[in-house]
Amino acid sequence: MKLKKKFLEKSKKIAEERIDVLMNLAEKESKDGKADRSKNYVLLGKKIAMRMRMPYPKEWKRRICKNCGSFLIYGKNARVRTKAKNYPHVVITCLECNSITRIPIKTEKK
């Protein structure tokens, strides 16, 4: 039983490293203007995470459009705005498919 647990921990660590490498490649390709290759890297990273049954890293999850799967580069193919109407939040708009992602901002309670 210990061997299996050790093997799973090691394979999850390898999967995290591969996802990180793929997302860095996706960022590089997206900056160079090769959006289709960037989407392929994102899909590969998602497949690895699903196969290993592990959550996608939060720092990368927010850089991917949930609707079209493109890698978001703020200012190039994504727009970022802060709003404070009902509750303070950040609005990220994908400029390729016009989907909106809202991320709440935690405020201090007085």
From Swiss-Prot:
Catalytic reaction list: Endonucleolytic cleavage of RNA, removing 5'-extranucleotides from tRNA precursor
Main location: cytoplasm
GO cellular component term of the entry, any: ribonuclease P complex
Requisite cofactors: Zn(2+)
Keywords: Cytoplasm, Endonuclease, Hydrolase, Metal-binding, Nuclease, tRNA processing, Zinc
Gene Ontology process terms (BP): tRNA 5'-leader removal
Xref: InterPro entries: RNP4, Rpr2/Snm1/Rpp21
Gene Ontology molecular function terms on file: ribonuclease P activity; zinc ion binding
Binding positions (Zn(2+)): 65, 68, 94, 97
The organism's place on the tree of life at top rank: Archaea
Job description of the protein: Part of ribonuclease P, a protein complex that generates mature tRNA molecules by cleaving their 5'-ends.
Subunit structure: Consists of a catalytic RNA component and at least 4-5 protein subunits.
Family: Belongs to the eukaryotic/archaeal RNase P protein component 4 family.
Name used for this protein in its record: Ribonuclease P protein component 4
Source organism per UniProt: Methanococcus maripaludis (strain C6 / ATCC BAA-1332)
